[in-house]
């Protein structure tokens, strides 16, 4: 098989890059091994939430200079402020076209309510999630009802309510909790392993008398002005939840549950469907194993399902994710990228070849290994033994030099690098 571009990884970075390339007339294939991190995500995307010194960030433009000073190896610092802002704006335009149902702007972060009742700075959020402006002194409603589902332990209304009321923006609120019984779920309640958001959503969409669900939500909501629900209403898209909102006449909001996250699943499905609609190929259930590199170029790769006959392409994109997705792995004496074994980078706290530096003593502290990843140049090209591989690029969390969890920038790095890679591939092919 031969394509213009082969992308390893079907997450946010891989799909974003693939969509942009398909729009420019390139023939792309995505090698997708299992679920992406989007299926476990909150439904929100971060551009930059805080600096390495712990300072919270209201806007990327405000925080960039300090980021460049404190962490010059961050991928953003390779591109420059204006390039990152341009790509963030471009991504917003892309997802508006796809109708991803998100709110927010690269110009300023906003708060989203977390499932545990926290307030998290973020860039873009699904429009079904409760959010508020950073400068709002009070949440927009005074009476909030948090509804759980009887027997469902992946969403805890009481815990959310007790934590939420601690924030100054919610001290004026009256927050009550209640449980929905939903008799149609009794079969799932018999097996706790099956009582998960995906299973609940499937049953509610296909077996439930919709009117009874509407009435139970209205009754349990009492005099609540804003109703917070676990994200269990609508598996493939937001239509079922939107219909619930319309029929109840209430201000309904969804909060992501413990994985799998339906909000993230919906976003991933929309991106994937759009990529395929543009003519892209997805090789599901396959895994890239090794590559043939000659004259500083990748000639072909072999996968689990294509071990005898390689997959050829003009350009290759590594968007396989970090340790969570097995895009990076560890052996006893070093951290490495397993397919191409390219050069790695971390931050000042870690030595890639000294495992004693990989972790911090406190479990809750930022872990140094999370900053490890592949080293790139300003074109997102990779290096092997110090030599640039001309047709191999990286996008997303496989890139090192920063801690996405600590800084709140994982999604931002994914889309900025993905769009940068797409531009560079198009430019390279136009030169030929």
From Swiss-Prot:
Protein keywords: Flavoprotein, FMN, Oxidoreductase
Pfam family membership, one: FAD_binding_2
Tree of life domain: Bacteria
Catalyzed chemical reaction(s): a quinone + sn-glycerol 3-phosphate = dihydroxyacetone phosphate + a quinol
Gene Ontology CC annotation, any one: glycerol-3-phosphate dehydrogenase (FAD) complex
Gene3D superfamilies on file: FAD/NAD(P)-binding domain (3.50.50.60)
InterPro entries, sorted: FAD-dep_OxRdtase_2_FAD-bd (IPR003953), FAD-oxidoreductase_2 (IPR050315), FAD/NAD-bd_sf (IPR036188), G3P_DH_GlpB_su (IPR009158)
EC number: 1.1.5.3
Entry-linked SUPFAM superfamilies: FAD/NAD(P)-binding domain
Molecular function terms, GO-annotated: glycerol-3-phosphate dehydrogenase (quinone) activity
Swiss-Prot/TrEMBL cofactor(s): FMN
Pathway(s) where this gene product acts: Polyol metabolism; glycerol degradation via glycerol kinase pathway; glycerone phosphate from sn-glycerol 3-phosphate (anaerobic route): step 1/1
One Gene Ontology term from the biological process aspect of the record: glycerol catabolic process
Oligomer status and interactors: Composed of a catalytic GlpA/B dimer and of membrane bound GlpC.
Job description of the protein: Conversion of glycerol 3-phosphate to dihydroxyacetone. Uses fumarate or nitrate as electron acceptor.
Similarity comment: family membership: Belongs to the anaerobic G-3-P dehydrogenase subunit B family.
Name of the protein: Anaerobic glycerol-3-phosphate dehydrogenase subunit B
Organism: Histophilus somni (strain 129Pt)
Taxonomic path: Bacteria, Pseudomonadati, Pseudomonadota, Gammaproteobacteria, Pasteurellales
